Amino acid sequence: MSSMKIAIAGASGRMGRMLIEAVLAAPDATLAGALDRTGSPQLGQDAGAFLGKQTGVALTDDIERVCAEADYLIDFTRPEGTLAHLDAALRHDVKLVIGTTGFSEPQKAQLRAAGGKIALVFSANMSVGVNVTMKLLEFAAKQFAQGYDIEIIEAHHRHKVDAPSGTALMMGETIAAATGRTLDDCAVYGRHGVTGERDPSTIGFSAIRGGDIVGDHTVLFAGIGERIEITHKSASRVSYAQGALRAARFLAGHQAGFFDMQDVLGLR
């Protein structure tokens, strides 16, 4: 297999640096580009400087140049940035791995439509563990569909800008689908004041922000006399980076299509 030429968007950020480190360590991948936001003080620096390495790849804000030199773009940025990168990827036939969260439904529709022209994987969480957890939740939701209240509690670092997290929403969507509903029909986001008794048909969400928490997610099935908790905790972003590389390898066998990590891992 030839080496995958991979570019990283948001290259100077926490996740971007982890992705660069993972690409440099992968025997089947080459760092082909490092994209950063316009105005970033890191522009022009070597992408491996934070590791004390010289990669020969400088941080740039030129998406056209990056896409001209890469075959894959891994993007964990923000929705507006990802959509701009998507346009360039379509022009240059670059395959996309998208871990960005916070998309609106119309924006998600744009990503799905792009799958008709290029190959892309979109997932709110690239971790293998989280995606196996989704299968556990699908099974549990069917068993606890009656007589159990469902709550999703997530915690992230103080810098996270969207809530609930994309992973929490993905968990809610999985549970809702397993019980024949849509999340829009049953989600309750936070509670305040006199809320009245809990509607047993709802799925509740609570979000915690603080410190350097990488990502904790717990789904609580609360019945009478017992509680079942399914929890996933991320100790570092390494699992996200390794999952993103796994997604890129999966895309090597596809010219077009819209996929998620369930497809990548063969969990469907």
UniProtKB/Swiss-Prot annotation:
Its EC number is 1.17.1.8. NADP(+) binds at residue 37. (S)-2,3,4,5-tetrahydrodipicolinate binds at residues 157, 166-167. It is found in: Cytoplasm. The keyword Nucleotidyltransferase does not apply. It comes from the Bacteria. PANTHER family: 4-HYDROXY-TETRAHYDRODIPICOLINATE REDUCTASE 1, CHLOROPLASTIC-RELATED, DIHYDRODIPICOLINATE REDUCTASE. NCBIfam families: dapB. This is 4-hydroxy-tetrahydrodipicolinate reductase. It comes from Burkholderia pseudomallei (strain K96243). The lineage of its organism: Bacteria, Pseudomonadati, Pseudomonadota, Betaproteobacteria, Burkholderiales.
